[in-house]
């Protein structure tokens, strides 16, 4: 037995019962609030409209936030709510200290924060440090060359060719296509923008700017929030000038000959620079200032679409801790509608193998930048993936609507408003548009799915909302939402909170894992990725389990046994594209620790 302060979560490798290599993952016996947290992302424009303008707002969130507590959520993360011209829907901030008027007032925010505190929900805000809006006062002052703001952004005079013609400082390409450099007539220099030209990059090689952004964090921490999700981290730093010049990036050799496409280059100079990790550590020091005051842990969650070894590096080290939760996007980037059980296991192990010792895993299946689970991975597998999300060891993150299996809504070119898509053309915009995954939340079968009473909403409500909505699923005997709620409730039991973890694949398509606590019992989770029903060889895969009769805790809708019934695992067959959670208690102490 390990000491009480340490539990081993054993990840068994291989495709059979032939041995395993254990991977120890530290868990404190007395869990901190976030260590087994269930987090939920709200996209504020799309959650609930309280004033009838067709746009979600803070009062709407406050009015409906009890729903999140009801479905078993611990922490809520809000996408940006700060003052913005909305060229990138809040990721272009013109005042880091003010609330966007469409969303409400500072008083509305404080009311929301108080409501969250009163019902035990932890509130997380987006922090967008890479850039501001070009309408930010600091950019205006920087463009005019006024100190101390002159070097708050990244400026360069460019390069003169033999004919005296001025060109951008380097060949760097924006994430949103085209040159990452924009000429300013006022300053007579180029400024860097890794995203839109209206989103100039901040200069983190300027200590005054670094302190400015730390003060932004302190302002919101003083409002009582529990932490930050930090946006677009790989772009925070670029390589430094060499002899007054920036190095060009090499051609990628990928399947594009479009020089405006960011995939045209390999981003050796503009992504994943080593200084980024130290900056995250500095931000961790800021939130730790507040933790030290009252012994309530404030957390950092990081967003970085990059190689897994870079993602996990954001955990930091014992000497220089970083993010408690560097988002794990492996289940998003590595899985498709055609993925097999082995593909799923490979995605899981790609993260657990890369994690540093003592770190806590997290699992993310969707967000505002990626197609919804039901559309990307298959409607039939929506419950299967939510079962996995809630039963794998570690932290779970759910994007609004995934609990009811919302789907992407097709949006025409004429109605498209996402800048990533608008920078493309009618033939290719769907490859880039994120509008389909940001449609209004489907509360009911009423007007605009209960989201708003406006004549027109900011994005159209998805087709099929009359059948697919919260009210209908709460009323149904079985539903995606009720399965989700069964899972979140059971997740708080010791078997899922503390249980050792042994993972198996059976053939190509059946995944099984066992979570167990000595003296308490065990849980077996089975996920059938195959096209045919699958038997569950529990006894052979997990020697020592003994009993063949197990209690059903939750299952996919197409799986027949309902929660609370018992099945004989020797006889039962799990339906295709389905998951099931089975329990056997051997003791009585399965309550939360």
UniProtKB/Swiss-Prot annotation:
Q: What SUPFAM superfamilies would the database entry show?
A: (Trans)glycosidases
Q: Binding positions for Ca(2+) 1? A: 49, 51, 53, 55, 57
| Catalytic activity, EC | 3.2.1.20
Q: Binding residues for N-acetyl-beta-D-glucosamine, per the UniProt record?
A: 338
The glycosylation sites annotated in the UniProt record are 130, 163, 295, 310, 338, 414, 445, 453
The signal peptide, as residue positions, is 1-19
Lineage: superkingdom: Eukaryota
Q: What class of enzyme is it?
A: hydrolase
> What is the annotated role of this protein in its UniProt record?
Functions as a glucosidase that shows high activity toward sucrose, a major component of nectar. Assists the mosquito in its sugar-feeding capabilities.
Give the similarity note.
Belongs to the glycosyl hydrolase 13 family.
PANTHER family with a match to the protein in the record: ALPHA-AMYLASE FAMILY MEMBER, MALTASE A1
The entry's protein name is: Salivary alpha-glucosidase
Gene name, Swiss-Prot/TrEMBL: MAL1
